[in-house]
Amino acid sequence: MKLREVKPEIRVLGIDDGYYGPEDDRALVVGVVMRGGQWIDGVMSTEVTVDGLDVTDRIAEMVNRSKHRPQLRVILTDGITFAGFNVLDIKKLHEETGLPVISVIKRRPDVASVVSALSNLDRTEERRKIVLRAGPVHSVKTRRDEPPVYFQCAGVEPDVARVVLKRTATRHRLPEPIRVAHFIATGVTKGESSSDA
């Protein structure tokens, strides 16, 4: 599906992971379906392996089996690393779901540092390729008086992704669907949500 028009109530899925401790081998991943950055239409979840390589498949399965799938127009994720260094392949997720994927981060990523950190894990080369495959890092100011957010995207042009991010950043510089997913995931896994995504 090619995203060309960004309506005010575009159906967006925001995804983030919850807290996991050093003894945990699995982590909760929560998806929140919202209309723009205003109304919650649904919540979905899955689990992924800490420092594994299954996040792309688990999220694709979560999305494709959801009753909300027909209404979804774009997936927003909180970065490309989940549950430690379980690296999300945004291009593969786009291919498997047919939806544009925008990975959002608060600070400009240091790709070299991420690639270096991956050397401590198994299947280093596979992880490195996924990180590099995410493509160039873009930026957008979603709120007038706040710093920009950074993003990588698959299945959508950067200029259209910028419109999506501005439209969904209704209360903070990060898109509201990602923030709500963060609050739910950390609230469930820690007993209380943290103050910010």
Swiss-Prot record:
Taxonomy, superkingdom: Archaea
InterPro entries to which the protein is assigned, alphabetical: Endo_dU (IPR002802)
Pfam family, one: DUF99
Family: Belongs to the UPF0215 family.
PANTHER family: UPF0215 PROTEIN MJ1150 (PTHR39518:SF2)
Name by which UniProt lists this protein: UPF0215 protein MK0057
